[in-house]
A protein has these predicted regions:
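An N-terminal-biased, well-structured beta-alpha scaffold segment characteristic
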Residues: 1-101, 224
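Alpha-helix C-terminal capping/helix-to-coil transition sites in glycosyltransferase folds
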Residues: 50-51, 71-74, 204-205, 230-233, ...
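Glycine-rich, N-terminal phosphate-binding loop of Rossmann-like dinucleotide-binding domains
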Residues: 58-59, 82, 211-213, 240-241, ...
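Rossmann-like adenosine-cofactor binding region
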Residues: 63-66, 183-277
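Rossmann-like dinucleotide-binding domain for NAD(H)/NADP(H)
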Residues: 100-101, 234-331
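Phosphate-binding beta-alpha-beta segment of Rossmann-like dinucleotide-binding domains, i.e.
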Residues: 103-153, 168
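Glycine-rich Rossmann-fold phosphate-binding loop(s) that bind the pyrophosphate
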Residues: 159-160
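N-terminal Rossmann-fold NAD(P) dinucleotide-binding loop
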Residues: 163-164
Length: 331
C-alpha cells in the first residue's frame, strides 16, 4: 500500500478536493491530509511527509527540497494538482529523478472551452450588440455584420494540452482548423485534427486566432506589430494563454485602428494598470484571468489527480507525467 501525503493547505483542500476524492485515494493507500493553513512550520511539513511514497501538491505547496526528500527516501512520485510544476520542484528533486505529473490537461479543458466561447460570441457580435441594445439601439441590419461559426478558418497557436483540446472542440463545427507549433510535425498536427502552417500563414488566412502558447523565452512577444498587421480585417484574436506572448502596446495600436476584435483573458502584468487602454476599447473583451479551471471546475483537477494516482499504483504510464529533461520549454 502506498503512503500518500496530501500536502495541500486547508484553503486549497476546500476548493479542489472533497471527501469523494479522498475516499478514492484511500482505496490506493494510507492517506494523510495536511492539517494547517500555511507551510510556515518547516518541521511540521517535514514530519507530515516523512515516509511518504507519494506526495500530492497544488498551488502554494512548498518546494520539494532536500529536507523533504530526505524525510521520504522511498518517494516514488509527486502528483501536482495544478499547472506548472516549476514552483514545487528543486534542483535536488531533478537530480533524484523523482517522477512528477501535473494537472495541465484538466485545467486546459476549461481554458479551451472559454476560448471557444469567446470565439463564437465574438463572431456573432454578442458583446457589441448587447452594448447597443442596452443603450437603446436596435440594429435592424445586424444580420449583415455578424459571422456564423461555419466555414471559417480558425487558427490555434500551440499544440499543447490546451491547443489539442481546442481542436477537439472545434471538430464539432464545420470550420477549417489550422495550427502553428514549431515543435510538432505536420503528421503529428494532422493526427490532432488540424493542418500545420507557419505563424505568418495562420495569421494571414484565419478569421479567428486562438493563442495557447506557453510563457517561455521563445514565445515572449511572439505576436507583435510586424505580424499582427497580417491579420484579416474583422478577424478575432483570443488570448487565454499568457500576456507575455503578445506585445501589448502593439496589440493596442492595432486594435485602435478598429480592424480587429480581441478577447483577452491574460495581460502582462496582471492586473493591467487602471489607465490601460484595453480596459476602454470597444473592440476588446477583457476578463480577469478566468479561462482556466475555476470555482466548481477545480474538481476536474481532483479527478485528474486521482486518475493519475490510480495509474501510478497500477503500474501504468501517467497521462501527464512531465519529462524533467524538457523543463526549459515548458511553462
Amino acid at each position: 500500500m502506498e503512503k500518500i501525503a496530501l500536502l495541500v493547505d486547508k484553503v486549497h483542500q476546500g476548493k479542489i478536493f472533497s471527501e469523494k476524492y479522498y475516499e478514492r485515494m484511500r482505496k490506493l493507500g494510507e492517506l494523510k491530509i495536511y492539517d494547517a493553513d500555511s507551510y510556515d512550520d518547516k518541521d511540521y511539513v517535514r514530519n507530515f511527509v516523512a515516509g511518504s511514497t507519494v506526495i500530492v501538491t497544488t498551488w502554494g505547496s512548498p518546494v520539494i527540497d532536500k529536507d523533504i526528500l530526505d524525510a521520504c527516501p522511498d518517494l516514488k512520485a509527486v502528483i501536482h494538482a495544478a499547472g506548472s510544476i516549476k514552483p514545487v520542484i528543486s534542483d535536488e528533486f531533478i537530480a533524484r529523478r523523482i517522477r512528477i505529473t501535473n494537472s495541465a490537461v484538466a485545467i486546459g479543458e476549461g481554458v479551451a472551452e472559454t476560448a471557444l466561447g469567446f470565439a463564437i460570441s465574438a463572431c456573432k457580435g454578442f458583446y457589441q450588440l448587447n452594448r447597443d441594445t442596452s443603450s437603446g439601439i436596435w440594429r435592424e441590419n445586424a444580420f449583415d455584420t455578424v459571422i456564423d461559426f461555419y466555414d471559417i478558418n480558425v487558427g490555434v497557436i500551440s499544440g499543447g494540452y490546451v491547443g489539442r483540446h481546442m481542436v477537439k472542440l472545434l471538430k464539432n463545427f464545420h470550420v477549417n482548423i489550422y495550427m502553428y507549433d514549431p515543435i510538432l510535425t505536420a503528421e503529428q498536427i494532422s493526427a490532432i485534427g488540424a493542418e500545420k502552417v507557419s505563424l505568418e500563414e495562420l495569421l494571414t488566412k484565419c478569421d479567428v486566432v486562438s493563442v495557447h502558447a506557453p510563457s517561455i523565452p521563445e514565445t515572449d512577444n511572439m505576436l507583435h506589430k510586424g505580424n499582427l498587421c497580417l491579420m484579416k480585417d474583422k478577424a478575432v484574436l483570443i488570448n487565454t494563454a499568457r500576456g507575455s506572448v503578445i506585445n501589448e502596446q502593439d496589440l493596442i495600436d492595432e486594435l485602435k485602428t478598429g480592424r480587429l476584435f480581441a478577447c483577452i483573458d491574460v495581460t502582462n502584468p496582471e492586473p493591467p494598470v487602471e489607465d490601460n487602454e484595453l480596459r476602454r476599447l470597444d473592440n476588446v473583451i477583457l476578463t480577469p484571468h478566468i479561462a482556466g479551471t475555476v470555482s466548481n471546475g477545480l474538481k476536474r483537477i481532483a479527478l485528474h489527480a486521482c486518475e493519475e494516482l490510480e495509474r501510478l499504483v497500477g503500474g501504468e504510464k501517467m497521462r501527464t507525467e512531465v519529462n524533467l529533461d524538457e523543463l526549459a520549454r515548458l511553462a
